[in-house]
């Protein structure tokens, strides 16, 4: 069963769109480096209170692949620095991990 990870980013007021894009691209590239598949950035266009929220989607073939990707990403000093950077344009994020339901 496919595992889908969604990370909703909540940006700080003030950063330029260019700075936000650079930050997201770096994180996406690191996620891909460590095995995340189908890494895609989305923005809520008609999403109620989530309208305008930037969301990163990534998939893994199964829970084993997801775990390996997460372990590798979180052990990477570049990812750690990106997540802990006080000058990041991202204030907070929420991650949701879901599993597909076959034959539905």
Q: Model-found features: residue ranges?
A:
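Surface-exposed interaction/gating patches
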Residues: 1-14, 18, 102-103
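Short, well-ordered beta-strand segments in beta-rich or mixed alpha/beta enzyme
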Residues: 2-10, 41-74
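Short amphipathic alpha-helical segments
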Residues: 15-39, 71-83
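Glycine-rich beta-strand-turn "strand-cap" elements at beta-sheet edges
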Residues: 34-55, 78-104
